[in-house]
């Protein structure tokens, strides 16, 4: 369950035509809907909605507010239901996602009486990128009661620009690759993902791979269904 959620949080663009625009949605009233399907079978695993509710200034940054909801194949809400979250956009257009704080918010929904603490460094996506750019590592550690979950995201690299078509439409995207290692009670995961981001929107597609005898094997794909 935690692994699936973190993939969403990471939940994380073609030709510089919109260079400088942050890689996130900043439009209150807009709702982005995603669907994750299993590789091979095409089985629906979940649906995610990100309902953007507000934008506010905080120092020199812009804080984007949204409500994050995950539903299972049958439509029932998971992870404690709707959860308020934020993304920060710095003055230079860099998008900053504190994955630890996002996970902390969901776990608070699920375990409202448990003491919590979080630490780490956020995942950053600069507004202007080029193939070959290396992005800073991101780390998080969330403690809920006696349980601790850590995540280390390394090897973050800009692969290419690509125009792709998903159910929500056709988008010019930047493609990022990253290596993620998770540690927690009953959960030890080591995966690589490729992620397509569109300026002014955010995630458009997410492919998750695990390694089998040293070879990457596609596990699942998540795409933007409605925008």
What spans do the regions from the language model cover?
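Hydrophobic h-region of N-terminal signal peptides that target proteins for export
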Residues: 9-18
């Amino acid at each position: 369950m935690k692994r699936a959620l973190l993939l969403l949080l990471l939940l994380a663009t073609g030709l510089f035509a919109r260079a400088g625009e942050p890689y996130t949605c900043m439009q209150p009233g807009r709702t982005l809907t995603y669907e994750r399907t299993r590789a091979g079978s095409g089985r629906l695993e979940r649906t995610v909605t990100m309902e953007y509710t507000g934008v506010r200034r905080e120092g020199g940054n812009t804080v984007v507010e949204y409500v994050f909801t995950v539903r299972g194949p049958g439509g029932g809400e998971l992870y404690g239901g709707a959860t308020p979250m934020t993304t920060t956009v710095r003055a230079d257009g860099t998008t900053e996602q504190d994955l630890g704080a996002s996970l902390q918010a969901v776990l608070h929904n699920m375990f409202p009486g448990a003491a919590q603490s979080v630490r780490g460094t956020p995942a950053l996506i600069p507004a202007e990128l080029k193939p070959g750019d290396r992005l800073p590592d991101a780390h998080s550690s969330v403690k809920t009661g006696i349980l601790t979950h850590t995540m280390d995201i390394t090897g973050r690299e800009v692969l290419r620009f690509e125009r792709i078509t998903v159910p929500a439409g056709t988008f010019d995207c930047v493609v990022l690759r990253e290596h993620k290692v998770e540690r927690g009670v009953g959960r030890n995961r080591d995966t690589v993902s490729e992620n397509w981001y569109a300026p002014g929107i955010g995630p458009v597609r997410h492919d998750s791979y695990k390694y089998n005898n040293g070879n990457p094997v596609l596990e699942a794909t998540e795409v933007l269904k409605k925008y």
